[in-house]
A protein has these predicted regions:
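Helix-turn-helix
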Residues: 13, 17, 21-55, 59
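Amphipathic alpha-helical packing segments from all-alpha helical-bundle domains
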Residues: 84-85, 104-140, 146-149, 161-170
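Short, basic, alpha-helical segments at the C-terminal edge of helix-turn-helix-like DNA-binding modules
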Residues: 63-67
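C-terminal peripheral helix-coil segments that are non-catalytic and often amphipathic
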Residues: 126-129, 154-218
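Hydrophobic alpha-helical connector segments
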Residues: 69-113, 131, 141
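Short, Lys/Arg-enriched anionic-surface-contact patches
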Residues: 1-10
Length: 218
């Protein structure tokens, strides 16, 4: 009877398995030895596809970032595009929170992250934002999204009513926050995003008015 064939080792399979290990046990738990074992191969086999562990991590980071939708910058007004992008970005990161610290190191050499930054910056500049301000806006949204994905505010409170009632009277209901994690965390994100976009919209109006008034008449 022929022996069952092992699944073909590919870059995509390596990346998917590495991400699954990171999701399960954290970024620090990933090693080439453990990854090879999970794939059912010897460690050196990985180096036919990736030269180093950092290359694997970059590919994992790129796979996560590649799921972010930036299509709104080509078809919608800049406020709607930023909103859609921020929510899509948050969904991609909260699905894999353990990789967020690595993603936070910056786009650097990662194609998907650079493509995302290019789409955001290009969309904002086309909308009339000054280049420097477009850079600031993209960075601000990125900080906001990444920070929200690093951990849950609601889950940071223990389910012990006595702890809060005895020492922190204004937090007497805090033990219930974990029950409402999704609504609390998403509601907080929506509030912050709305405030940020509202402020940017007001600034945009002032910026456009300034540019228009500076143009020569006639």
């Amino acid at each position: 009877m022929p022996r069952p064939r092992r699944p073909l080792l590919t870059r995509d399979r390596i990346v998917e398995t590495a991400l699954a290990l990171i999701d399960a046990d954290g970024l620090g738990a990933l090693s080439t030895r453990r990854l090879a074992a999970a794939l059912g191969v010897q460690g050196p086999s990985l180096y036919n596809h990736f030269a180093t562990k950092d290359e694997i991590l970059d590919a994992v980071a790129d796979a996560v970032t590649g799921a972010v939708d930036t299509g709104g910058f080509a078809s919608r007004d800049w406020v709607a595009a930023l909103r859609d992008w921020a929510w899509s970005y948050r969904r991609a990161l909260t699905a894999h929170p353990n990789i967020v610290p690595y993603l936070a190191q910056g786009p650097g050499r990662r194609p998907a992250a650079l493509a995302m930054a290019d789409a955001v910056y290009g969309g904002l500049v086309r909308a009339g934002w000054p280049p420097a301000r477009a850079t600031h806006i993209g960075a601000a949204l990125r900080y906001f999204v990444a920070g929200s994905a690093l951990g849950s505010f609601a889950r940071g409170f223990v389910e012990d009513p006595e702890l809060y009632a005895a020492h922190y009277p204004h937090l007497r209901q805090a033990h219930r926050l974990a029950e409402h994690q999704q609504s609390v965390d998403e509601g907080a994100f929506a509030l912050g995003l709305d405030a940020l976009l509202h402020g940017l919209a007001a600034e945009y109006t002032r910026t456009v008015d300034t540019v228009e008034s500076a143009r020569p008449n006639g």
